[in-house]
Amino acid sequence: MKTDYTDISFANNGKLKLLIIVGTRPEIIRLSEVIKKCRLYFDCILAHTGQNYDYNLNGIFFRDLKLDDAEVYMDAVGADLGETVGNIIAASYKLMTSLKPDALLILGDTNSCLSAISAKRLHIPIFHMEAGNRCKDECLPEETNRRIVDIISDVNLAYSEHARRYLAECGLPKERTYVTGSPMAEVLRANLTEIKASDVLTRLKLEAGKYILLSAHREENIDTEENFTSLFTAVNKLAEKYNMPVLYSCHPRSRKRLEESGFKLDNRVIQHEPLGFHDYNKLQMSAFLVVSDSGTLPEESSFYISEGSPFPAVCIRTSTERPEALDKGDFILAGIDEKSLLQAADTAVMLKKNGDFGLPTPAYMDENVSDKVVRIIQGYTGVVNKMVWRK
């Protein structure tokens, strides 16, 4: 763990000094256009906790999304979860003490977001994107992180009115809660030319509309024996029923779990290292069926419906923190048990065949989220200092 940050400093160019902390692939993706805009208007430093340290889960996305490397790498991953969380808090505290930023921006519900605890102790205004998301499932570690970070953040930036209501139910100040919408449409629009130009189908010898795309990495799906067995039994049956390749974008932890379990996958199931942003989205656009536990699935489905490239989207979870996408019929919440998953897959395929695609989710369609975030940070840093910290 890195604890000495005396080699890092802001430019001190008279602009607001903003620290952005990330640690995982979803944060990098969602924040990519926001980071670019913040670098344009603020004195900005990007710090990476190291939570995802594999290149295919991290570095490849900096390249694809045309992001400059992070100025700070905390190397906070420990021997176990407790050590990692402790390191994130300790390292971020040292970093903030050294840098003395005017504000902190974080997104989501990862362990890296717990760096907000350090900012709170140091009276640094905290801006939290993706605030108010709730799936109401206390078994998920992300749900705990959401509650912690929402409560201690000074300004919460929600994706939807659903999320704003959840924040209000927690008693959080309405005057410091804003609905910005999801940043994903802006990210997808900025990368759409590269996505469409990807030659990933040729490289992987796949034919559009004749393969199933699978992404499964969540703790509840991989680490729970019953769910793991049910999920991959269903995957084998999908490969058999439709007699087509199932391309599995397989995280290192998931691959290790499969190897240790000895579970035999159908020979049509192809394990592949995690794909880059452009390649994965091209695969989604062109798939016969997408089966995923990714948090970005509802937003990507909504965007491609609006673009005229809908794909059958099945979410392998029992709960969702994105009810607004269910409101518009953008995906099917399938559950994890074998029977439900197979039925959901069949239904999704038939819906597309019949031209029933759902509707774009309004909360996911704004393409100026980065502008909103810049304005709110600039306007409310001083407000928080005055109203909360009495500076």
What kind of feature is each model-predicted range?
Residues 2-7, 51-56, 75, 152-225, ...:
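A nucleotide-sugar donor-handling region in carbohydrate enzymes
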Residues 16-22, 27-34, 41, 61, ...:
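Active-site and donor-binding regions of nucleotide-sugar-utilizing enzymes
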Residues 74-75, 158, 179, 270-274, ...:
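Short acidic-hydrophobic, aromatic-tinged amphipathic segments that line or gate anion-handling sites
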